[in-house]
From Swiss-Prot:
The UniProt record lists the keyword RNA-binding: yes
PROSITE patterns: HELICASE_ATP_BIND_1, HELICASE_CTER, Q_MOTIF
Function field: ATP-dependent RNA helicase.
SUPFAM superfamilies in the cross-refs: P-loop containing nucleoside triphosphate hydrolases
UniProt catalytic activity: ATP + H2O = ADP + phosphate + H(+)
Pfam family membership, one: Helicase_C
Enzyme superclass (EC): hydrolase
InterPro entries hit by this protein: DEAD/DEAH_box_helicase_dom, DEAD_box_RNA_helicase, Helicase_ATP-bd, Helicase_C-like, P-loop_NTPase, RNA_helicase_DEAD_Q_motif
Motif residue range(s): DEAD box: 488-491
EC number: 3.6.4.13
GO annotation, cellular component aspect: nucleolus
Gene from which this protein is expressed: ddx24
GO molecular function, one term: ATP hydrolysis activity
Protein name according to UniProt: ATP-dependent RNA helicase ddx24
Organism, as annotated: Dictyostelium discoideum (Social amoeba)
Taxonomic placement: Eukaryota, Amoebozoa, Evosea, Eumycetozoa, Dictyostelia
């Protein structure tokens, strides 16, 4: 018996113990199983060791008092030698005692029982009798005793380790416990395998013979006990695995559920943000109580509509609303309206529609109030993939007969349809009416499911609407109860070659029974034209001679076949008892100079304009009123219109100058998708936050880019004319016409994206010499001057360097991408055709000079690309300063200039320049007047 020697080490804590190490058959007792954490830090470990020492002393005292005669007699009765075994039989008393210690101390099965078990095993150990003539191999004997001792201690201490693991097993360090248990289990399996392999070596060859049957029986019993013990250990290990498996699975499941829940929460937050942006924001109840709604009371609107307007904070109607609502609500006329962009046209036809639906439902005793006063969630949210669950129960007091399609609104673009839906939804928040949008680019199955909820108002684009009508959806086919029809941006809908489905949709709409048929109108028109032609109208020419009217009327007669087609069309048409109310609106509907006017005064009969053709196709069932609130100035009053004359190569420079010089929400319009695709990578290389919006993009991506443009502060959106009409994007400070718009209507609609709702805005037109004739036409049709935008030439040198580098980088990267695409295409085609391509094709595995040249050229290209990117990165890291100003040597004048530039905006710079120009002109006039006055005095 030897005491433990202590070695001084600064990294380990000295612990004084009376622990004894037994180098007999027990092997190196306890060294492998000591927890290294017990040697680190602290007072807790010292307290544990003191408790262990006290427990050892008590156990030693108890063992001394117990009689040990039975153990000695058992060990001495055997006369014959016994073979060495790997493990000793387990005593039942020892097991029960061990179980009690496990409950008292967390390290009980690990250190405390070790000394006790060693004493017990030493007492139970059978003495080995060696004859003088017998030879013994000490190496094998020592090896066998060492293995027996280590294995024996391992088995004894397993339960202590398990107790420790169960106590330390909690939610916070569950994963650490798994990592500790796994290597221990592997070691146990390895040692068991080694044990089985070494078992035949443990029996030294001896010439002893077993003649006694009792001894054989005892040996068999010992073997049986050992086998049972091994089985118990295996069962315990299996139980541990079974216990831990479900815990692991549950943990994994909960982690997955947590991740899914986090994703859903993020999606819901995005939905809320987008809804707040897209929908009209409501005000607080205190602000609602302070609002004066007296101007709305004169229109006799439903109180639920007034509640919705109050919650939005609309205390008074706009000009177009005050002109349309009395005519549509009180008098019941159809309306053809024209107003500037951002003037409230959507609610101008939305309020009369909702008013008529509510009147119809109240007249038939139906419930229209939303008792919960919650906003509708039935709209298929086009901005997200997450579907909102809807209640399938019908509203209280509403029968199925009165849950039909009462109002239909047709819009040219998907984004405009979604915007109109949100505007109408905001005023019906206190009713139980439903409004949805049906647009392309979304799953038709989902939209069919939303239509099955039978919404009263549908806002749609012509393509998807006609698709669902032809499929025979019940809610869109049953149009007998249609009360209102709205067409927004009508001039866009009647453009040649666009929206062919609109005419088919208008033909499917029901006709009022008492209304005049198309056949009758044509007959009446024909008779009037014949009467006018037969009448001799006298006219005077320039010379004063009399001219008679034309009497030829054969060309204007309608053939019989056309009359038969009209009769069949009238028979196939749906009829209704309701007189449908129609609203046709646009910003450039009427009063555009040159549109629809005759080319010469000599022509007696002018050709019908597209709008007049639309009016014929719509089949107004009431008398209509034409309401035009557009002013002589077709754009908004608070819009500053400017221009920049430049060369084609300088357009990118001026665009980057404007974006870098005046940060904010900038909307750039181009005439083609190719132009947008060319600009996007250049501005991405220049690290400008830029997004695209054009017709060839997927609807989901278009909506995402629009939402990003709405949420970010300093951002650029490069768009085609898809974004020119109807979109209400808040706080757009700048609109840049990168290419001159082809028509005046496009210019007005593009410029109308800024300076909305009494906010300031500026539009800039970039004009090249080639586009100058188109700009002259635009300038003459607008009938007011467009000023020159002030540009600081000192900044242009730095802008030019950045643009040239970005263009060169884009060119090289685009060429490499193009080559890679071609190679990948050839590879794909070769794989499909089971053809092997030569290595020369790709410049690989070839000694040809051309292939080496191509490799060298490619390496040079890549090196040059890296160089250019490094140069551009260096330029972008520095602020854009005017020529003559240095970052190293800052002067007082430079500081003042930088402060004024940082605080200025495009509008202020333009207004300051205009003031300076006016001041110069005033000075010149004053000097001229003064000189004239002096000359007069001299003459006198």
């Amino acid at each position: 018996m030897a005491k433990k020697k202590f070695v001084e080490n600064t990294n380990w804590k000295k612990i004084d113990t009376d622990n004894q190490l037994i180098f007999e058959q027990g092997g190196f007792l306890g060294l492998e199983e000591i927890d290294p954490n017990d040697y680190f830090l602290t007072d807790k470990n010292v307290d544990k060791i003191e408790k262990q020492q006290k427990q050892k002393q008590k156990q030693e005292q108890e063992q001394e008092q117990k009689p040990t005669n039975k153990l000695t007699t058992k060990s001495t009765t055997k006369s014959t030698p016994v073979q060495n075994k790997n493990q000793k039989p387990v005593d039942k008393k020892r097991k029960s005692k061990k179980g009690n210690d496990d409950s008292d101390n967390e390290y009980s099965g690990y250190q405390d029982d070790s000394d006790q078990d060693d004493e017990y095993s030493a007492a139970k150990k059978k003495p080995r009798i060696i004859k003088p003539t017998e030879t013994v191999d000490m190496g094998t004997e020592l090896l066998n005793s060492f293995v027996e001792g280590t294995v024996h201690n391992k088995k004894k201490q397993r339960k202590g380790i398990k107790v420790k693991q169960i106590i330390d097993d909690n939610d916070n360090d569950f994963e650490d416990e798994e990592e500790e248990v796994k290597p221990q289990q592997k070691l146990q399996k390895q040692k068991q395998q080694e044990q089985k392999q070494k078992q035949p070596q443990k029996q030294p060859q001896q010439p002893n013979k077993k003649n006694n049957k009792k001894e054989l029986q005892k040996e068999e019993e010992e073997q049986m006990e050992e086998e049972k013990e091994e089985e118990e250990v295996q069962q315990e290990e299996e139980e541990e695995k079974e216990i831990k498996k479900p815990i692991k699975e549950k943990k994994v499941k909960t982690q997955k559920q947590i991740e899914a829940a986090k994703k859903n929460i993020n999606k819901l937050e995005k939905i809320k943000k987008r809804k707040e942006i897209s929908e009209q924001k409501t005000i607080s109840k205190e602000e609602q109580d302070q609002l004066d709604m007296s101007e709305w009371n004169s229109y006799n609107l439903d109180p639920l509509i007034l509640k919705g307007l109050r919650s939005l904070g609309f205390s008074k109607p706009t000009e177009i609303q005050s002109s349309v609502i009395p005519v549509a609500v009180s008098s019941g006329y159809d309306v053809i309206g024209a107003a500037q962009t951002g003037s409230g046209k959507t609610l101008a036809f939305g309020i009369p529609m909702v008013q008529r639906i509510l009147q119809h439902l109240r007249k038939h005793g139906q419930n229209v109030e939303n008792k919960a006063n919650k906003q509708q969630n039935d709209n298929d949210d086009e901005n997200e993939d997450v579907e909102e669950e809807e209640e399938e129960e019908e509203e209280e007091g509403r029968s199925k007969e009165y849950r039909k399609l009462f109002s239909l609104v047709i819009c040219p673009t998907r984004e405009l349809a979604i915007q109109v839906t949100n505007h109408i939804k905001s005023i019906i928040s206190h009713t139980n009416l439903k409004v949805i949008s049906i647009v392309g680019g979304m799953a038709s199955q989902r939209q069919q499911r939303v239509l099955s909820k039978r919404p009263e108002i549908v806002v749609a684009t012509p393509g998807r609407l006609w698709e669902l009508i032809t499929e025979g959806h019940q809610h869109l086919v049953e149009l007998e109860s249609l009360l209102c029809l709205g067409i927004d941006e009508a001039d866009r809908m009647v453009e040649q070659g666009h929206f062919a489905e609109l005419e088919s949709i208008l033909k499917t709409l029901p006709i009022h029974r008492t209304a005049m048929s198309k056949k009758e109108r044509l007959k009446k028109k024909e008779t009037e034209e014949k009467r006018n032609k037969r009448r001799k109208v006298d006219k005077l020419n320039d010379k004063g001679e009399m001219i008679k009217g034309d009497q030829d009327d054969m060309d204007d007669q309608i053939p019989d076949e056309e009359m038969e087609e009209l009769e069949q069309e009238e028979q196939n048409h749906l009829t209704t008892t309701h007189k449908r109310q129609t609203f046709v609106f646009s910003a450039t509907l009427v009063n555009i100079p040159g549109d629809g006017a005759p080319t010469s005064q000599k022509k007696k009969y002018r050709k019908l304009t597209p709008i007049e053709n639309l009016i014929e196709k719509v089949r107004f069932q009431r008398d209509y009123k034409l309401i035009d609130v557009t002013q002589k100035r077709l754009t908004a009053k608070n819009l500053l219109e400017t221009k920049i004359f430049c060369n084609l190569e300088e357009k990118d420079m001026y665009l980057y100058y404007f974006v870098e010089r005046y940060p904010g929400r900038t909307l750039v319009f181009v005439n083609s998708i190719d132009c947008a695709r060319r600009l996007i990578p250049i501005f991405n290389i220049l690290e400008v936050p830029v997004f695209a919006l054009h017709a060839q993009m997927q609807q989901k991506q278009r909506l995402k880019n629009l939402d990003r443009f709405r949420t970010l502060d300093n951002v650029v959106l490069i768009a085609t004319d898809v974004a020119a009409r109807g979109l209400d994007i808040p706080l757009v400070q700048h609109v840049i016409h990168y290419q001159v718009p082809r028509t005046t209507q496009l210019y007005i609609h593009r410029s109308g994206r800024t300076a909305r709702s009494d906010q300031d805005g500026i539009s800039v037109v970039l004009v090249t010499p080639k586009e100058r004739p188109l700009y002259i036409k635009l300038d003459s049709s607008i009938e007011h001057d467009i000023g020159n935008f002030p540009t600081d030439i000192r900044y242009m040198e730095g802008v030019r360097d950045r643009i040239e580098l970005a263009k060169e980088i884009d060119k090289l990267s685009h060429q490499s991408l193009k080559d890679n695409r071609e190679k990948s295409w050839f590879k794909k085609q070769a794989e499909e055709m089971d053809i092997e391509l030569d290595g020369d094709f790709f410049g690989e595995n070839s000694d040809d000079e051309q292939s080496e040249d191509t490799r060298i050229a490619e390496q040079k290209k890549q090196f040059k690309l890296k160089q250019l990117r490094a140069q551009l990165k260096h330029l972008l890291s520095r602020s854009l300063l005017p020529r003559g100003v240095s970052q190293s040597y800052i002067t007082a004048s430079a500081i003042q200039e930088l402060e004024s530039k940082s605080q200025s905006s495009a509008a202020t710079d333009f207004s300051n320049k205009a003031k300076n120009v006016i001041g110069k002109k005033a000075k010149q006039l004053a000097i001229e007047n003064h000189s004239k006055f002096l000359t007069k005095n001299k003459k006198k």
